[in-house]
Regions:
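Alpha-solenoid helical repeat scaffolds
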Residues: 1-302
Length: 302
């Protein structure tokens, strides 16, 4: 490993491997010197100093861990990794009150940048998963954060992702709707809600999501696609036809040809139901130009 390090230079992966080997050899001094050298090699990258603190803490060197975290925070007071690591230090040393204060300072303080709070919350989730996989603690913290700052869309988005990862789709719905209230352009939240509505065949909900989705993101063809289907299911054929025609105005060279083909194919179906055969065949022709394998268009054409 030393020879490889001479060739490619010091890096995290090599240093961590050497650290583990030295620990197995029960040479703690050389093990920690390895990470200390890594931190010295990259003095402006606080990740390595924080990593050194974490390794101190994991190996029972609590005072060294505390001093290292304080050093990081003296250089970068807003360093989320170090702030959370310090909270972990307080927890592991039985200082529950200081632990809770540190967590609250990080997660329930509007002066802390939103991105920092989200990063810390991710660390909080990882720690909770490693310790007990108990979701109640994480959910309780998310609920407190949402009450503290109801206008930040990043926190509820992370909350919804967490709930979905736990199979709690029903509980994620109001959280995702809160995201859209804050930021109607959040396509990820809207598409997740849309997927849920489609699985339940709730076409009124699909309409309620896609209509404002088009206003917020007029270039997103997915919303036109599903809105047209929902209108069709609701027997609003003229509305479906109009929305597909509107969608075609936003087609670009980068648009998925299969989606554009489906627009034309569904327009053909609507024209066919209205006995407008010339328009129907013209639409099917266009569908096959974009996707010669469009089964729906081929069958209807036949």
């Amino acid at each position: 490993l030393d020879r490889l390090e001479q060739i490619i230079g010091k890096n995290e992966q090599l240093s961590m491997e050497k650290f583990r080997i030295y620990l197995q050899m029960e040479d703690d001094k050389k093990a920690f010197q390895e990470i200390e050298k890594l931190a010295e090699e990259y003095p402006m990258d606080m990740r390595y100093l924080t990593l050194l603190g974490d390794l101190y803490l994991q190996n029972g060197k609590k005072q060294e861990a505390y001093s290292t975290y304080q050093k990081v925070l003296s250089i970068e007071p807003d360093n989320a990794m170090a702030m959370f690591a310090l909270a972990s230090y307080y927890e592991q040393t039985g200082q529950k009150e200081l632990y809770q204060q540190q967590i609250d300072t990080l997660l329930l303080n509007n002066q802390v940048p939103s991105e920092t709070r989200v990063n810390v919350m991710r660390e909080f989730i990882v720690q909770a998963e490693q310790e007990s996989k108990d979701s109640t603690r994480v959910i309780a913290m998310f609920d407190r954060m949402l009450r503290q700052d109801p206008d930040d869309d990043q926190v509820p988005m992370l909350y919804a992702q967490y709930l979905l990862s736990k199979g709690m789709e029903k509980e994620s719905i109001p959280v995702l709707k809160q995201v859209l209230q804050i930021d109607p352009t959040n396509t990820a939240a809207r598409m997740t809600l849309l997927g849920s509505a489609i699985r339940k065949n709730d076409f009124q909900e699909v309409i309620g999501l896609c209509e404002p989705g088009i206003e917020a993101n007029p270039e997103s063809l997915e919303f036109y696609y599903y809105l047209g289907i929902a209108y069709y299911q609701a027997e609003r054929l003229d509305d479906a036809l109009a929305i597909y025609q509107r969608a075609l105005q936003h087609v670009t060279a980068d648009s998925k040809k299969e989606v554009v083909s489906d627009f034309y194919s569904m327009m053909g179906d609507i024209y066919h139901s209205k006995d407008k055969m010339a328009e129907a065949y013209a639409a099917y022709d266009s569908a096959l130009v974009y996707n010669p394998s469009n089964i729906g268009a081929l069958n209807n054409y036949a």
